[in-house]
């Protein structure tokens, strides 16, 4: 075999256009600068605040308000907090002063203290409300509910709510949390106590009904007595009047006859009525004589 040398003709390799490598590097550098500029901007939306973590000094004490702010990329990182008041319902099962089990639910409207956001992040993190509110609410509810009887929790509900609010506000300050409102939304008791309350209400209703019936009977009795006394007085007055003037009976008879005649006159049938029917047989109308005996 003939040994042939393998030779490469470099003249056949296509050459890159001049400046192509430099142009690609320029585009890459421009993209890096744009990305760097973009990562150095932090937008804080309305109702939010930001704090900055620095890799060298840790959390800065400055709180950034709403708007756009500059940070050093990679060296600094922004943490955004929602500082608007947020509602949260928390339930607790506790005992009252008279040893009744009470299931109470309160609604808490809370928000972080803006000036203390760096301290909140250092000690509690971003889920500060999850860490703090359930524990302090249960603590306060158990201590306050134990001061009242079960019936007082119902009749003095507003006072209990105000006391819970005052105690919770003072306790939440220890964790840099502000409370705008605290209200009792649900208040339930054990089955035995609920049955006892229902039985008591039924007994009270029955007692009220019995009291009403007694009062009504007394009123009816008084009415009958007053009516009887009135009829007796009326009869006595009529008797005295007849004794003094016999013509009173004739006047009453005439009034009755007039009423009978008026009623019969409206009848479509023609009727002929004697004096006896009209009660006029007792005296002479022309001579005004006394009634016949």
From Swiss-Prot:
Q: Does the keyword Lipid metabolism apply?
A: no
Q: Give membrane topology per the record.
A: Single-pass type II membrane protein
Q: Give the InterPro entries listed for this entry.
A: Band_7, Band_7/SPFH_dom_sf, Prohibitin
Q: Which CDD domains match?
A: SPFH_prohibitin
Spans through the membrane: 21-41
Where can this protein be found? Mitochondrion inner membrane; Cytoplasm; Nucleus; Cell membrane
Q: Which UniProt keywords apply?
A: Cell membrane, Coiled coil, Cytoplasm, Membrane, Mitochondrion, Mitochondrion inner membrane, Nucleus, Signal-anchor, Transmembrane, Transmembrane helix
Disulfide bond entries: none
A single GO cellular-component term from the record reads: cell surface
Q: From the UniProt record, give one GO term of the biological process aspect.
A: mitophagy
* Function, as annotated: Protein with pleiotropic attributes mediated in a cell-compartment- and tissue-specific manner, which include the plasma membrane-associated cell signaling functions, mitochondrial chaperone, and transcriptional co-regulator of transcription factors and sex steroid hormones in the nucleus.
Give the family this protein belongs to, as stated in its UniProt record.
Belongs to the prohibitin family.
> What name is this protein filed under?
Prohibitin-2
Which organism is this entry from?
Dictyostelium discoideum
High-level lineage? Eukaryota, Amoebozoa, Evosea, Eumycetozoa, Dictyostelia
């Amino acid at each position: 075999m003939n040994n042939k040398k393998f030779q490469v003709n470099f003249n056949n390799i296509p050459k890159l256009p001049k400046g192509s490598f430099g142009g690609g590097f320029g585009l890459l550098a421009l993209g890096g600068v744009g990305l760097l500029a973009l990562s150095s901007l932090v937008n804080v939306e309305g109702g939010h605040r930001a704090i900055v973590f620095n890799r060298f000094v840790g959390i800065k004490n400055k709180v950034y308000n709403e708007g756009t702010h500059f940070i050093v990329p990679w060296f600094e990182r922004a943490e955004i907090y929602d500082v608007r008041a947020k509602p949260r319902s928390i339930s607790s099962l506790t005992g009252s002063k008279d040893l009744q089990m009470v299931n109470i639910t309160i609604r808490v409207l809370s928000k972080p203290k803006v000036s203390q956001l760096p301290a909140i992040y250092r000690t509690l993190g971003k889920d500060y409300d999850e860490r703090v509110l359930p524990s302090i609410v249960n603590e306060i509810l158990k201590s306050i509910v134990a001061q009242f009887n079960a019936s007082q929790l119902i009749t003095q509900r507003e006072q209990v709510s105000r006391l819970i609010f005052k105690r919770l506000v003072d306790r939440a300050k220890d964790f840099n949390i502000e409370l705008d409102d605290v209200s009792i939304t649900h208040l339930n008791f054990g089955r035995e106590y609920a049955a006892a309350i229902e039985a008591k209400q039924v007994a009270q209703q029955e007692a009220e009904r019995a009291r009403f019936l007694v009062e009504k009977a007394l009123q009816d009795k008084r009415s009958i007595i007053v009516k009887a006394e009135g009829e007796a007085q009326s009869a006595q007055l009529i008797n005295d009047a007849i004794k003094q003037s016999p013509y009173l009976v004739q006047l009453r008879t005439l009034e009755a006859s007039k009423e009978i005649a008026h009623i019969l006159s409206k009848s479509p049938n023609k009727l002929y009525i004697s004096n006896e029917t009209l009660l006029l047989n007792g005296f002479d109308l022309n001579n005004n004589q006394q009634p016949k005996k």
